[in-house]
Amino acid sequence: MKKLLISAVSALVLGSGAAFANSNVPDHAFSFEGIFGKYDQAQLRRGFQVYNEVCSACHGMKFVPIRTLADDGGPQLDPTFVREYAAGLDTIIDKDSGEERDRKETDMFPTRVGDGMGPDLSVMAKARAGFSGPAGSGMNQLFKGMGGPEYIYNYVIGFEENPECAPEGIDGYYYNKTFQIGGVPDTCKDAAGVKITHGSWARMPPPLVDDQVTYEDGTPATVDQMAQDVSAFLMWAAEPKLVARKQMGLVAMVMLGLLSVMLYLTNKRLWAPYKGHKA
């Protein structure tokens, strides 16, 4: 029983954190971390606004149902707004009729494919080693040290000017101190061919600038704030039931604890008269 209780506690604590094991990514405190952590509804709404107005141009979320925007524990947007929002997205081919129709709230978010489009963000925030995601999601990024809300946040704010070792004329590539698997020019490598820069170059340009969106709640739209908000939103998109699972884990811990106490007291009452007496 003690081992079972310890296992339950360990599973809850390990499952509640969202940090992926990557020493190159500084930790960032999110409201949903920890045993008692939960999503900040206002932050999820701001994050959805950033995704919708900025990120969705190049990144899809094809595994996320649009209707979940109205669910409890998430952005909890008005169902009427969600229906209208879905109808304004890219049209979809109906599976039954084969004809083009407006997207419904029961459909998934659109996907983005083609030259210049980025990876799907449906489960990018799942920070689990060995998690490869649904088929076709391109989640091999996780095996390369990418993924998790901390990574997304640090990546978005990680764009910097080219280091001094970079040659002139690196057009179409952008240096990011968090991005570890991109290209590195020979001038930024040592004699052994090992890069001397902390980060590398990505094809994706810096996605955010200050005041790029206007938050409805009046929150200043700094790059740092928008990066935090969209990272939290993508975590919710990947783990919409995270808080519910934590609550179930807490209930299980309490019940296991009570059961352990009851078993101890029962054992003591039944066997105490016989213990210590020699035959």
UniProtKB/Swiss-Prot annotation:
One of its GO terms (molecular function) is metal ion binding. This is Cytochrome c1. One of its GO terms (cellular component) is plasma membrane. Binds 1 heme c group covalently per subunit. PROSITE patterns: CYTC (PS51007). The keyword Transmembrane helix applies. The main subunits of complex b-c1 are: cytochrome b, cytochrome c1 and the Rieske protein. It is a single-pass membrane protein. It is found in: Cell membrane. InterPro entries: Cyt_c-like_dom, Cyt_c-like_dom_sf, Cyt_c1.
